[in-house]
Curated annotation (Swiss-Prot):
Gene designation: glgA
One Gene Ontology term from the biological process aspect of the record: glycogen biosynthetic process
Domain of life: Bacteria
HAMAP family for this protein: Glycogen_synth (MF_00484)
Pathway(s): Glycan biosynthesis; glycogen biosynthesis
GO molecular function: alpha-1,4-glucan glucosyltransferase (ADP-glucose donor) activity; alpha-1,4-glucan glucosyltransferase (UDP-glucose donor) activity
Record-linked Pfam families: Glyco_transf_5, Glycos_transf_1
Coiled coil: none
Protein name, entry field: Glycogen synthase
EC id: 2.4.1.21
Organism: Streptococcus equi subsp. equi (strain 4047)
InterPro entries with a match to the protein in the record: Glyco_trans_1, GS/SS, Starch_synth_cat_dom
Catalytic activity of the protein: [(1->4)-alpha-D-glucosyl](n) + ADP-alpha-D-glucose = [(1->4)-alpha-D-glucosyl](n+1) + ADP + H(+)
Family classification: Belongs to the glycosyltransferase 1 family. Bacterial/plant glycogen synthase subfamily.
Cross-referenced CDD domains: GT5_Glycogen_synthase_DULL1-like (cd03791)
């Protein structure tokens, strides 16, 4: 099977979040199953700086972005048996950042047109074309409405994955003619219209052969007004082709037995190194070195989506307990200031690290006994899976991917991989934390059982990719 991915970012070339992780890992896993996999990405300046000496120039051509005749350079790099093609246009992609420019609509309109036309130029016509988030969401529409006359493209089946429905790509409808060079009919008949805007994501949901989200629970949630961001009715209408597949994590990279960032290695069979890692982190951050105190970690963007309003609301109560908290992340300036204030007020209980530091993040996963992740909504989430791999037991709001990946502890059946609360409130966050602390202090055998279950749960991409393969095969 020939599978092609088109996305705005992908590790290790350019990455800002979970989308980049998926594009870095899923193709690599599919290749292991004997499939021919390629990826099309923009050739950003950050890619040029890090990989410019490794890529090869394949060809170039020109495409029409409305009335604009734009250069399209194709560069190529084979990595882990996956063929990466890069769309090169310095005017659009050498901006010092991936997103956030005033002309993002034009930039990604160009990228989608160039990617579609590049398939024929480089001679790679996939069986499955898998596009991701709004930046590539017009591709299924364009294949059926603009490029349908190209015979080689007529057998291509498209899959669209929603990583976060909040970012839909809403633009002025004049873009259809001005950039995509197609008629306005599909806007005027309501197909592409949403609140008097052209909505790229709506186009993908209606035109793609299959639509996926990054967890089964999120696939259900986006069909409701509470989580659908205005597209819930469209999601319900297209529910027959909507499904959720949980992201995996790179289990080679996130492995406490071989993590170079940890001062001591450990595994589910031998946890002695975890105690040494905990002591090293306490020393590094200036917390009292105590093996008996529960160490609670938080590694996250400091935003409302991640539930930090609940954490701040309950922090005075939580800090009355005999616990230590370690925070790592940046985000909303109000949250940054609040956690910094609490860290100064409680220097022996809270270490607030307002930065992004990958080695420190790995040490927090490795050192902590508990991991706090009370997100208001979470399409999938990766941190909770990483924490479990390192024996840090997650406390989560049971929503989206958190609900699908963390099984709440059952005291009677002795099952579960963490602790969860259903109601998004500070009260239930604190009650769940107190319950977890009781198990930690007073039921050591149960705690060790939870830790074993968490550390041995299979979150590998090899498992997740099989679900995608089943989906692809159903289309052929």
């Amino acid at each position: 099977m020939k599978i092609m991915f088109v996305a705005a970012e992908g590790a290790p070339f350019a990455k800002t979040g979970g989308l980049g992780d998926v594009i870095g890992a899923l193709p690599k896993s599919l290749v292991k199953n004997g499939h021919e996999v390629s990826v099309i990405l923009p050739y950003y300046d950050v890619v040029d700086q890090a990989f410019g000496q490794q890529v090869e120039d394949v060809l170039y051509f020109y495409t029409q972005v409305g009335w604009r005749r734009q250069y399209v350079g194709i560069k190529k790099l084979v990595k882990d048996k996956v063929t990466f093609y890069f769309i090169d246009n310095q005017g659009y992609f050498f901006r010092g950042r991936i997103y956030g420019d005033w002309d993002d609509g034009e930039r990604f309109a160009y990228f989608q047109l160039a990617a579609i036309e590049a398939m024929e130029k480089i001679g790679v016509i996939p069986d499955i074309l898998h596009v991701h988030d709004y930046h590539t969401a017009m591709i299924p529409f364009l294949l059926k409405e603009k490029y349908h006359w190209i015979q080689a493209y007529q057998a291509i089946r498209t899959v669209f994955t929603i990583h976060n429905i909040a970012f839909q790509g809403q633009f002025d409808p004049g873009m259809l003619g001005d950039l995509f060079d197609v008629g306005i009919e599909r806007y005027e008949d309501g197909t592409l219209r949403w609140h008097d805007c052209l909505n790229w994501m709506k186009a993908a949901v209606l035109y793609a052969d299959r639509v996926t989200t990054v967890s089964p629970s999120y696939a259900h949630e986006i069909q409701t007004p509470a989580f659908g961001q205005g597209l819930d009715q469209v999601m319900r209408m297209e529910a027959g082709k909507l499904s959720g597949i949980v992201n995996g994590i790179d289990t080679d990279l996130f492995n406490p037995a071989r993590d170079p960032h940890l001062p001591a290695s450990f595994s589910a069979e031998d946890l002695s190194g975890k105690a040494a890692t905990k002591q090293a982190l306490q020393e590094r951050l200036g917390l009292p070195v105590r093996a008996d105190v529960p160490l609670i970690g938080m590694v996250s963007r400091l935003t409302d989506q991640k539930g930090f309003q609940l954490v701040l609301e309950e922090l005075p109560h939580i800090l009355q307990q005999d616990v230590q908290l370690v925070l790592l992340g940046t985000g909303d300036p109000d949250y940054e200031a609040a956690f910094s204030w609490f860290a100064k007020a409680y220097p022996e209980k809270l270490s607030a690290n307002i930065t992004f530091d990958l080695p420190l993040a790995q040490q927090i996963y490795g050192a902590c006994d508990l991991f706090l992740m009370p997100s208001a909504f979470e399409p999938c989430g990766l941190s909770q899976m990483m924490a479990m791999r390192y024996g840090a037991i997650p406390i989560v709001h049971e929503i989206g991917g958190l609900k699908d990946t963390v099984a709440s502890y059952n005291a009677y059946e002795k099952t579960g991989t963490g602790f969860g609360f259903d109601q998004f409130s500070g009260f239930w966050l604190t009650q769940t934390l107190l319950f977890a602390l009781d198990i930690y202090h007073n039921h050591k055998e149960d705690w060790q059982t939870i830790q074993q279950h968490a550390m041995t749960k299979d979150f590998s991409w090899d498992t997740a990719s099989l679900a995608y393969l089943d989906l692809y095969k159903s289309l052929l």
